[in-house]
Swiss-Prot record:
Name of the featured protein: Casein kinase I isoform delta
Regulation of its activity: Exhibits substrate-dependent heparin activation. Drug-mediated inhibition leads to a delay of the oscillations with the magnitude of this effect dependent upon the timing of drug administration. Inhibited by phosphorylation. Repressed by 3-[(2,4,6-trimethoxyphenyl)methylidenyl]-indolin-2-one (IC261), N-(2-aminoethyl)-5-chloroisoquinoline-8-sulfonamide (CKI-7), 4-[4-(2,3-dihydro-benzo[1,4]dioxin-6-yl)-5-pyridin-2-yl-1H-imidazol-2-yl]benzamide (D4476), 3,4-diaryl-isoxazoles and -imidazoles, and 4-(3-cyclohexyl-5-(4-fluoro-phenyl)-3H-imidazol-4-yl) pyrimidin-2-ylamine (PF670462, PF670).
Subunit composition and interactions: Monomer. Component of the circadian core oscillator, which includes the CRY proteins, CLOCK, or NPAS2, ARTNL/BMAL1 or ARTNL2/BMAL2, CSNK1D and/or CSNK1E, TIMELESS and the PER proteins. Interacts with DNMT1 and MAP1A. Interacts directly with PER1 and PER2 which may lead to their degradation. Interacts with MAPT/TAU. Interacts with SNAPIN. Interacts with DBNDD2. Interacts with AKAP9/AKAP450; this interaction promotes centrosomal subcellular location. Binds to tubulins in mitotic cells upon DNA damage. Interacts with GJA1.
Location within or outside the cell: Cytoplasm; Nucleus; Cytoplasm, Cytoskeleton, Microtubule organizing center, Centrosome; Cytoplasm, Perinuclear region
PROSITE patterns: PROTEIN_KINASE_ATP (PS00107), PROTEIN_KINASE_DOM (PS50011), PROTEIN_KINASE_ST (PS00108)
Region (Autoinhibitory): 317-342
Disease annotated for this entry: Advanced sleep phase syndrome, familial, 2: An autosomal dominant disorder characterized by very early sleep onset and offset. Individuals are 'morning larks' with a 4 hours advance of the sleep, temperature and melatonin rhythms.
InterPro entries for the chain: CK1_Ser-Thr_kinase, Kinase-like_dom_sf, Prot_kinase_dom, Protein_kinase_ATP_BS, Ser/Thr_kinase_AS
UniProt record, GO biological process: circadian regulation of gene expression; COPII vesicle coating; endocytosis; Golgi organization; microtubule nucleation; midbrain dopaminergic neuron differentiation; non-motile cilium assembly; positive regulation of canonical Wnt signaling pathway
Domain of life: Eukaryota
Length: 415
């Protein structure tokens, strides 16, 4: 018995969660390709997936926008089938011991600004800019940054007249508190400036490893958000960015200086970081930190394997008094046999390019990520899978995610 959607896509295991609904690994039966399938129960109090799928369709054709394969309803679920992507920047950040080099941060910043600019050009703001919502591509697109999850996106201007939405206050926080702009904390309607300010906090998060307002304790979520807001507003940008190139402070100051309906100068912000990139003498080779770690891990595995074989060889000779003290080739000739090296066990580096390891837990979480980075591994692992924790700082007044139960897919079953 297998589960199918759209009479073409085979439903596999759960691989993550979006702002509304759960994400599953799937297979395009006709093409033999793996895909991502997002499901949302139609009985959810505030269905959002059909809205998100419409936004994705409006975004189609943009660089770093996932391709949508199919949208529709199947039984008790709204379904969206989309291109399968690689690990998120949060996954990769954990893999790199929660610290990115300046080069990697600048390479990412360039693409991330462009993704946000493209969304804004399509008359929408994202409203949940965070590392989990930027994924790397797979295979030939392994160096391309994608932006995902439009569950909280909102139209900020009329597509025909470009009339901007009105300024409003007393709005509830929508998005993730850790990266929310100060104006969002103050209850001001979000606009283009807020997406970019959130990106500034993401970049400093990559630089620092954590932000000053992380880990704050409070009795309720509301009080926690208030503490985050107070800490964020009381931390001067120059203090937040101390020890790092001034361009990061310049970026954040620029974002905070924008008025509600201002169009940001995206080219200026990109050039700010590109000039820094060139002054540092970096090369646009798109070698990120995780690529270097992957290479280092492969080389270390090879060295360890050679050392193991040498150790076994020495032990074998030490147990044979007739050959003790003789080189391995000589001992082989004395026995009238050829010297045969012991078989090499499989290591993570010996997998084929499109093989994905099964998820593991506990002490092997980091190993799970390292084995799948840029090998064409199809699984999009969420940061909560890696850390065993969930980010509870995300809040939207209408967010009531639907959970998928296997028993609820009866109408999707094909025998």
């Amino acid at each position: 018995m297998e589960l199918r959607v759209g009479n073409r896509y085979r439903l596999g295991r759960k691989i993550g969660s979006g702002s509304f609904g759960d994400i599953y690994l799937g297979t395009d039966i006709a093409a033999g390709e793996e895909v991502a399938i997002k499901l949302e129960c139609v009985k959810t109090k505030h269905p959002q997936l059909h809205i998100e799928s419409k936004i994705y369709k409006m975004m189609q054709g943009g660089v770093g926008i996932p391709t949508i394969r199919w949208c529709g309803a199947e039984g008790d679920y709204n379904v969206m089938v989309m291109e399968l992507l690689g690990p998120s920047l949060e996954d990769l950040f954990n893999f790199c011991s929660r610290k990115f080099s300046l080069k990697t941060v600048l390479l990412l910043a360039d693409q991330m600004i462009s993704r946000i600019e493209y969304i804004h050009s399509k008359n929408f703001i994202h409203r949940d800019v965070k590392p989990d919502n930027f994924l790397m591509g797979l295979g030939k697109k392994g160096n391309l940054v994608y932006i995902i999850d439009f569950g909280l996106a909102k139209k900020y201007r009329d597509a025909r007249t470009h009339q901007h939405i009105p300024y409003r206050e007393n709005k509830n926080l929508t998005g993730t508190a850790r990266y929310a702009s100060i104006n969002t904390h103050l209850g001001i309607e979000q606009s283009r400036r807020d997406d970019l300010e959130s990106l500034g906090y993401v970049l400093m998060y990559f630089n620092l490893g954590s932000l000053p307002w992380q880990g704050l304790k409070a009795a309720t979520k509301r009080q926690k958000y208030e503490r985050i807001s107070e800490k964020k507003m009381s931390t001067p940008i120059e203090v937040l960015c101390k020890g790092y190139p001034s361009e990061f402070a310049t970026y954040l100051n620029f974002c905070r200086s924008l008025r509600f309906d201002d169009k940001p100068d995206y080219s200026y912000l990109r050039q700010l970081f590109r000039n820094l990139f060139h002054r540092q003498g970096f090369s646009y080779d798109y070698v990120f930190d995780w690529n270097m770690l992957k290479f280092g891990a492969s080389r270390a595995a090879d060295d360890a394997e050679r050392e193991r074989r040498d150790r076994e060889e020495r032990l074998r000779h030490s147990r044979n008094p007739a050959t003790r003290g003789l080189p391995s080739t000589a001992s082989g000739r004395l026995r009238g046999t050829q010297e045969v090296a012991p078989p090499t066990p499989l290591t993570p580096t010996s997998h084929t390019a499109n093989t994905s390891p099964r998820p593991v837990s506990g002490m092997e979480r980091e190993r799970k990520v390292s084995m799948r980075l840029h090998r064409g591994a199809p699984v999009n692992i969420s940061s909560s899978d890696l850390t065993g924790r969930q980010d509870t700082s995300r809040m939207s007044t209408s967010q009531i995610p639907g959970r998928v139960a296997s028993s609820g897919l009866q109408s999707v079953v094909h025998r």
